[in-house]
Swiss-Prot record:
Residues 177-186, 194-210 have a biased composition (Low complexity). Residues 39-103 form the CSD domain. Residues 1-11 have a biased composition (Polar residues). The lineage of its organism: Eukaryota, Metazoa, Chordata, Craniata, Vertebrata. It comes from Xenopus laevis. CDD domains: CSP_CDS. Binds the B box promoter element of genes transcribed by RNA polymerase III and is probably involved in the regulation of class III genes. GO terms for molecular function: DNA binding; nucleic acid binding. This is B box-binding protein. GO terms for biological process: regulation of gene expression. InterPro entries: Cold_shock_domain, CSD, CSD_CS, CSP_DNA-bd, NA-bd_OB-fold. Keywords: DNA-binding, Nucleus, Transcription, Transcription regulation. Residues 123-132, 257-272 have a biased composition (Basic residues).
């Protein structure tokens, strides 16, 4: 009798133990402690991919890894939860304590994610600015021309042609190599005045040689010292059109005057040594000989008569 009573007492104890073990399920070889627990994210490191969630019922901190997030924000590139965000999760038993699993938002919604997590390219906050399509300008001009044609049907033909003018093209500056060719930069841009004499030109040339030469911006450039009057430069073929337009009649008149003046001075210098000044004694002798020669023919003519 006693043995039968003991066996009957052991059977309810075994049934109670089995009933207590039924809610404990496994999630990927981990024992589930609780399900659908609400908690607040204490902190989460996006770079390392882990953080802690504080349970609202027991005020216990639960470890959470980014792989445990079940429904992530579709706009975020990485899985994460934001600091102070309310989430819903399951508590499982890990190697070092309680861990969170199946982390979602309150209800079957995705989590908001951390503000430090990178967004996907398709969900940019400020999209890139793209220019108008290629045929946008042609379509715009065609629409404008159509509207103008409808409005100018009653207007004369002259006014219609004046309104439809092509847009002026923008002029860009020439490249650097055509603006300043190598080794052709003038040292001084001052033009001499017309009223200066030859001596003034020579003194000016000497003064320019005495001045310190301006350093050219090009490395390895050696200035060439000029001797004599400066030569007239021919206009550059690769110069700018604007520079040619700015050259007026004044520069041409200055150049012509300088060429004439230097020619006159040069001829004067060449002729000067050919006709030296005669001395006083030679002048008196020449005058006496000329007087004697003139008197002798006159006397011969008188005797003949």
């Amino acid at each position: 009798m006693s043995s039968e009573v003991e066996t009957q007492e052991q059977q309810p104890d075994a049934l109670e133990g089995k009933a207590g073990q039924e809610p404990a399920a496994t999630v990927g070889e981990k024992k589930v402690i609780a399900t659908k627990v609400l908690g607040t994210v204490k902190w989460f490191n996006v770079r390392n991919g882990y953080g802690f969630i504080n349970r609202n019922d027991t005020k216990e901190d639960v470890f959470v890894h980014q792989t445990a997030i079940k429904k992530n924000n579709p706009r975020k590139y990485l899985r994460s939860v934001g600091d102070g965000e309310t989430v819903e999760f399951d508590v499982v038993e890990g190697e070092k304590g309680a861990e969170a699993a199946n982390v979602t938002g309150p209800g079957p919604v995705p989590v908001q994610g951390s503000k430090y997590a990178a967004d996907r390219n398709n969900y940019r906050r400020y999209p890139r600015r793209r220019g108008p399509p290629r045929n946008y300008q042609q379509n715009y001009q065609n629409s404008e021309s159509g509207e103008k044609a409808e409005g100018n049907e009653s207007a004369p033909e002259g006014e219609g042609t004046n309104q439809q003018r092509p847009c002026p093209r923008r002029r860009y500056p020439p490249p650097f190599y055509s603006r300043r060719p190598y080794g052709r930069r003038p040292q001084y841009s001052n033009v001499p005045v017309q009223g200066e004499s030859a001596e003034g030109a020579e003194s000016q040339g000497a003064g320019e040689q005495g001045r310190p030469v301006r350093q050219n911006m090009y490395r390895g450039f050696r200035p060439q010292f000029r001797r004599g009057p400066p030569r007239q430069r021919q206009p550059r073929e690769d110069g700018n059109e604007e520079d040619k337009e700015n050259q007026g009649d004044e520069t041409q008149s200055h150049a012509c005057h300088l060429m004439r003046r230097y020619r006159r001075n040069f001829n004067y210098r060449r002729r000067r040594p050919e006709n030296p000044k005669p001395q006083d004694g030679k002048e008196t002798k020449a005058a006496e000989t000329s007087a004697e020669n003139t008197s002798a023919p006159e006397a011969e003519q008188g005797g003949a008569e």
